[in-house]
Amino acid sequence: MSFSILIAIAIFVGIISYYLWIWSFWIRKGVKGPRGLPFLGVIHKFTNYENPGALKFSEWTKKYGPVYGITEGVEKTLVISDPEFVHEVFVKQFDNFYGRKLTAIQGDPNKNKRVPLVAAQGHRWKRLRTLASPTFSNKSLRKIMGTVEESVTELVRSLEKASAEGKTLDMLEYYQEFTMDIIGKMAMGQEKSLMFRNPMLDKVKTIFKEGRNNVFMISGIFPFVGIALRNIFAKFPSLQMATDIQSILEKALNKRLEQREADEKAGIEPSGEPQDFIDLFLDARSTVDFFEGEAEQDFAKSEVLKVDKHLTFDEIIGQLFVFLLAGYDTTALSLSYSSYLLATHPEIQKKLQEEVDRECPDPEVTFDQLSKLKYLECVVKEALRLYPLASLVHNRKCLKTTNVLGMEIEAGTNINVDTWSLHHDPKVWGDDVNEFKPERWESGDELFFAKGGYLPFGMGPRICIGMRLAMMEMKMLLTNILKNYTFETTPETVIPLKLVGTATIAPSSVLLKLKSRF
């Protein structure tokens, strides 16, 4: 037998041994959980759009308990739904769990010039978070409220026309048009409403329907060839659409920069408040000195390499792209679930309409009036408890071996929260856990956050930076609809909802009627 054949056999045996070693990781640790298949683990369970992977977590939690282990290709993941464990990882030991679970397709967050805030880690994450946070402050939201109002008016006009014809409406489709319209104007330089004629909507839908498909499964199994995989799979529909969208964002940002430069040369002062996130990100500055270059295990410390106090061109593109994806999907889904629950609970809808009539008597709803709609906020929070959207993205990566509640977690281990089970845990929420009960929030949400039992937008320092914007959009639209209409079910309404999805859990449709109140 030739030496080259022996080398080939040795390499083959080494590869097989490595994958079997990873696959048996939790067995050797004595941690129970679904084993799946060698090489794959259970990664193939998360690629079926008709059977959401996040709901697989819930099935396994019922079988294995609130803490169990899985492998996803070469990734080792601990799935948790114990609220104390969640709080420990996301809040108390944040310095040990400040990274996120990433795939080879996403690239190295420390080298990617367009790394979004959601994927960044360490001091780069701190810098991006500090620079981006003012963009989502109440002060900034006031500045862009006019943009949201325009889309609200356009959607209500469309709903008025459709409801007058007695149609059963798929509210999910209407809400997707609404959120895409806002994002187009805020992030893509869109100058007017393109609702129901937006060419970008199908591109974004493709990303969400195919975004966690076999491309991500293969990259999870063979991460060592990540760069090659990114080049090979760039032609797949979901990744090609992502590239197309980033090109559009580049054009919009370049156009804005050219306009600013021309105005400056002509001595023209900026007029009015920023109307979109392109302006807000371009204006982002910080008086804080940032540092980079620290070793991962010394995240809490700083070294002396100073970096920019403003966002670069590529960083703005990265933030706009993720804002587009996250803002489109999660807000549309939250609105859909809220509308469905109101339609199936008319007594709660009536109570909410009474609050809307009392606090917003005038045709125009103001920013300050939104903050007075306490029961509406309870309704949305309860909808997000019953239908948490993004279990698969509620994850962290352990970057320093540590001990959590008596369990050793090795560096490199992923932590994924089974949010669905957590939000439906009777030990946290009581025996009425499966009931739609907005009143449970009337005393505030601090108790549930402190328990680690509620994370619709994540938890801890990495909590979703855009949650205020999402709440503003939802409250503004629902208020304007409920001032004039009542959601009603029809014989076509699917009860209970059929749930689908990959990265998020979505209803296949939300078929309702709108009945005029006047």
Swiss-Prot record:
Keyword Cell membrane: no
Annotated keywords: Heme, Iron, Metal-binding, Monooxygenase, Oxidoreductase
Tagged with keyword Iron: yes
Any GO MF annotation of the entry: heme binding
Residues engaged in binding heme: 464
Protein origin, superkingdom: Eukaryota
EC number, UniProt record: 1.14.-.-
Enzyme class: oxidoreductase
Cofactor: heme
PANTHER family listed in its UniProt record: CYTOCHROME P450 FAMILY 3, FATTY-ACID PEROXYGENASE
Similarity remark: Belongs to the cytochrome P450 family.
Protein task: Cytochromes P450 are a group of heme-thiolate monooxygenases. They oxidize a variety of structurally unrelated compounds, including steroids, fatty acids, and xenobiotics.
Name of the molecule in the record: Putative cytochrome P450 CYP13A7
Gene: cyp-13A7
